[in-house]
Amino acid sequence: MAKPAKPNGGAVGRNPERTRGRILSAALREFAANGFAGARVDAIARRAVINKRMLYHYFGNKEHLFREVLRRKITERQSSAEGLSGDPAESLPFWFKLSCRDTDWVRLLEWEALQGGGKKVIDEKSRRALATRALGRIRKQQALGYLSGEFEPGHLLLAMRSLTTFPMAFPQLTRLFTNRSVSDPHFQRKYAEFLKKFAAAFRPAVGRRNKTNYEN
């Protein structure tokens, strides 16, 4: 029987970008499983098959590593939305389907809420800037007639985030309310259809299509 690979900082370190990617992927799994407070650097190093010294060489400390994990995930999600129209009837099903595939992102946010409450979050300045841009897109959607102008943009954004992530964040309630597992393809298909109809039903006026990315 082959022996499991041992952490090897030297061999892996010959390709810095590859090593960095392995660390970030391992850290994502560890943070998603245990949250920031519960994640252990030695566990991340084992997942990445490197030694702790090399991990600290690349990222300094656990907080810096968590910040990079968040930035990487946000960049990935933004890239996946390129070309997405500003119509919520299209964007809501898209973000729901993405959340079904990207449950690690949902878990990261859940752990952050459980462990941090309403306190400042890691990398708050950059994330607040992203939120400000998202609110700007909500206002544009209101101006184009996709969303009612009578609601505050922040409330609309919060509701839209909830609609697209709640089933994955609370799978037990999804099962109790629908008699379906969130991983059930039938549920995913029907809920995506619901989101499309829901967004269309609450449209105050016929808005013209606007090919502006809507990042989640």
Stretch-by-stretch model annotation:
Residues 33-37, 102, 144:
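Short coil/turn segments at alpha/beta junctions that flank glycine-rich nucleotide-binding fingerprints
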Residues 100-121, 170-178:
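Amphipathic alpha-helical segments used for helix-helix packing
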Residues 78-82, 118-144, 154-155, 189-193:
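Amphipathic alpha-helical packing segments from all-alpha helical-bundle domains
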Residues 22, 26, 30-64, 68:
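Helix-turn-helix
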Residues 71-76:
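Short, basic, alpha-helical segments at the C-terminal edge of helix-turn-helix-like DNA-binding modules
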Residues 1-6, 94-101, 131-144, 162-216:
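C-terminal peripheral helix-coil segments that are non-catalytic and often amphipathic
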Residues 79-107, 127, 153-157:
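Hydrophobic alpha-helical connector segments
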